[in-house]
Amino acid sequence: MRKTPKNLESLHKFAEAYAKLSRTYFCIDQSITALVIEGLARHKDDYGAPLCPCRHYENKKTEVLAAYWNCPCVPMRERKECHCMLFLQPSNEFSGESQLISKDDLQKHLS
């Protein structure tokens, strides 16, 4: 069993709040939502910022300082384009109908 990131709860709350703020929705597949939130929390633990976990970086520390891919990333803020499929526009075929994921569902998909 993996160790739970210490920032999991704060990134969980952030994701729900930002989905509401941006009028986007979580993926219909809750395992994607859970894994992305976990990845953001791990990067926050390791690098001090929620760097997008769905991209490859030559140097994560440099990317954190550049801030372009820190969540919410520039493409998300400017065009509502989330590479990770965490924040989806309602018209996206993978968009669910929820801006919330329960703590139990989050943990279930991370176990």
UniProtKB/Swiss-Prot annotation:
GO terms assigned for molecular function: 4 iron, 4 sulfur cluster binding; electron transfer activity; metal ion binding; oxidoreductase activity, acting on iron-sulfur proteins as donors
- Looking at the UniProt record, the site noted as Increases the nucleophilicity of the active site Cys sits at 83
Which InterPro entries does the record match to this protein? Answer: FTR_bsu (IPR004209), FTR_bsu_Cyanobacter (IPR024707), FTR_bsu_sf (IPR036644)
What the entry lists under Pfam families is as follows: FeThRed_B (PF02943)
Q: Which cofactor does it need?
A: [4Fe-4S] cluster
Catalytic residue list: 54
Q: What class of enzyme is it?
A: oxidoreductase
The terms describing its cellular component in GO are: chloroplast
- Its EC number(s): 1.8.7.2
> What keywords are annotated for this sequence in UniProt?
4Fe-4S, Chloroplast, Disulfide bond, Iron, Iron-sulfur, Metal-binding, Oxidoreductase, Plastid, Redox-active center
Q: How is the cofactor bound?
A: Binds 1 [4Fe-4S] cluster.
Q: List the disulfide bonds.
A: 54-84
Give its localization.
Plastid, Chloroplast
Q: What is its main location?
A: plastid
The entry marks the following residues as binding [4Fe-4S] cluster, namely 52, 71, 73, 82
The UniProt catalytic activity note for this protein reads:
[thioredoxin]-disulfide + 2 reduced [2Fe-2S]-[ferredoxin] + 2 H(+) = [thioredoxin]-dithiol + 2 oxidized [2Fe-2S]-[ferredoxin]
Subunit structure, interactors included: Heterodimer of subunit A (variable subunit) and subunit B (catalytic subunit). Heterodimeric FTR forms a complex with ferredoxin and thioredoxin.
State the protein's purpose.
Catalytic subunit of the ferredoxin-thioredoxin reductase (FTR), which catalyzes the two-electron reduction of thioredoxins by the electrons provided by reduced ferredoxin.
| Family according to the record | Belongs to the ferredoxin thioredoxin reductase beta subunit family.
Its recorded name reads: Ferredoxin-thioredoxin reductase, catalytic chain
Query: Which organism does this record belong to?
Result: Cyanidium caldarium
The coding gene here is ftrB
